[in-house]
Amino acid sequence: HQQFRDLFLQRLVAPTDVGTDRGFDVVTLDDVVGDARHPFPVAHVAERTSWSCHHGVARWGAECPDAADGRWKAPLRAALERLAGAVDAITALTFREAIGEDPADARDAYVDVVLGRTTGAAFAAERWPTADEAVRRRLLDLLEAQRWRLAMFASDGWFWDDPIRPETRQVMRAAARAARLVDGLAGTRLEHTLVADLALLTSPSRG
């Protein structure tokens, strides 16, 4: 993501004359993922890299010159990082005390519930067969909190110029959902802290 690399890519994939061989094929993500005839390698995203402008990750936590006024981004990022830390700590502690496990594998597998491939009850029964119903329900609720904790970091929430946009409001809603779920389970006041932290950011257009 360096300056003018977008022009390079534009020229690279520009339509060619019929019969001209580029030496490579232009494909979409659907072309790759939709081909189930053979497996494809896992892609790893390098830390502190971005898919947008050449200013890099500043777009997602500081003031990027390509956005008119990014002073609201650092307080928002700090608020969500603080909430994420609390949600993770409570989730890890509860899983450890209830079933003696780290929650990471269950969190990743919970996507099957989110996508409707299985029900929460079936998921819990398969993963925690010796746990009683109350424990299973509590662990499922924490995985749901983890779902929203991940959703609140959706990158489009920081991409634009103003936090009043729907993308940023959506990440705040996700954060509130995660906080409320954990507060209901653990008796914490994460939503109260989140609201106080979010009060530090202002909208360039509305103050």
Task: List where the protein language model places each region.
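Active-site and substrate-binding clefts of carbohydrate-active enzymes
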Residues: 1-207
